[in-house]
UniProtKB/Swiss-Prot annotation:
It comes from the Viruses. GO terms for biological process: virion assembly. A zinc finger (CCHC-type) spans 590-607. Residues 1-66 are cytoplasmic. This is Glyco-Gag protein.
Amino acid sequence: LGDVPGTSGAIFVARPESNHPDRFGLFGAPPLEEGYVVLVGDRGLKRFPPPSEFLLSVWNRSRAARLVCCSIVLCCLCLTVFLYLSENMGQAVTTPLSLTLDHWKDVERTAHNLSVEVRKRRWVTFCSAEWPTFNVGWPRDGTFNPDIITQVKIKVFSPGPHGHPDQVPYIVTWEAIAVDPPPWVRPFVHPKPPLSLPPSAPSLPPEPPLSTPPQSSLYPALTSPLNTKPRPQVLPDSGGPLIDLLTEDPPPYRDPGPPSPDGNGDSGEVAPTEGAPDPSPMVSRLRGRKEPPVADSTTSQAFPLRLGGNGQYQYWPFSSSDLYNWKNNNPSFSEDPAKLTALIESVLLTHQPTWDDCQQLLGTLLTGEEKQRVLLEARKAVRGEDGRPTQLPNDINDAFPLERPDWDYNTQRGRNHLVHYRQLLLAGLQNAGRSPTNLAKVKGITQGPNESPSAFLERLKEAYRRYTPYDPEDPGQETNVAMSFIWQSAPDIGRKLERLEDLKSKTLGDLVREAEKIFNKRETPEEREERIRRETEEKEERRRAEDVQREKERDRRRHREMSKLLATVVSGQRQDRQGGERRRPQLDHDQCAYCKEKGHWARDCPKKPRGPRGPRPQASLLTLDD
């Protein structure tokens, strides 16, 4: 076409065959059909719109184009939301604590069946803050492991000041959920281990529970704080040979024989040679540890003195691991004398130690100064035949000797001496643990903001034991302890306890129960904020009403004063008029009122000026506006 004259630079333009306005192609574009091509020269050249204008024209002229574009945008948006939710849901972790909070109605129903009451805020506090500090392996997000729950329950039910009575309903409810799990707990409960056959050989004691939570996908990874104090290591009971402290033979000792291939401990012993001295009680003890216990023996082998199968008492001294654990897992005597005294008391009652064992126990758990103080107080507690403390040196040395006595624990007399010695030693520990009387220390013990009344009472009793010579458990001191409990409780609890009816007849237990009810009914921080806001609004409304009433009273008083002033002015003017008329002299019947001469009246008085009469002046009255 370029050879045709006059057609250089010509282009093809598509025009529809018909000029009908409703005929369009896809998305509103004009259709290109055969037979519709027109050759146009330079003069008739028509400029086409750019692609952007073409797209806008398609959007404005076609409903199908708008529908397709909206569908594409909506699909992209849905796909983005789906990918975002799938990624976030994959990172969510379900924990026992969150599981119980999601099903809190079932938790409350379980607690109601156990006749206890639980609250969600304290449930979260105990699970995430209190129970992890017991060092029994409880994670901050909770667990359904029955072993760990049992360990926490033992801590909660501990007698004395170390127990937590306020946490009893919560751990009991948690244990009930783990033992009899609802349907929403069963997938997370640890399966019970299969029953195994009884071992043929005596097994080692179980390892203590670890302080770290079990490795499971149910528990998130917990990071330990940077400044955590390392726990003292608990040594297991050593099964190796011990040194015979009772024998007088110096080391070296004979080496034990090589162990047998079958692992039987009896073959590892070395038979005594002929002419060798009789084995000491320690050697008998070492042999007895490798032998199975006697069938008819019901006492623990951990006791220093235990009754053997032949009716003779056998001596089992303390192991080094026991002494190490007692020393490193308990506070010092100066720091907490009550706790260490309770430990030594339990050891004295259960292990039945001899005089040497008592000295070893005191030397391990007490310092030199503390030991001397305990021994001095114990010797002061020795009583004579009349039941009073004695000062006779012979009686004191017989009952509580400072040097090793010749008490034979195989005889009844020797065992009686040991029992009396342990009682005196326990009395010395209790007396030495008391600080000088300081009632200010007792008065300084106050209830914390979130401390339960039971825990506060235990701290108060401990202060009485430590800083006063009185025993808080004595019925004669119950009134003093009760008054201190009321006055030193939290302000809200103390005010309500003081308003109790017949307060004098209430026992200390009744006061603690009432305080527990008040403590459990305390308002939450949200309720407290709502109450403060409501009281503030009521106070503002009351203040505004008082201001309005005061303004009305002020206006009424001002109006009353102005009325009194107006009445006073008017009455004064009236009195002036009446008084002026009375002061005029009385005239005779023929006397002039104007010139006071007789013979004519005032209207005929020649001295009175004649002329038009002016207007009579009007009396002016004061109004409130003036």
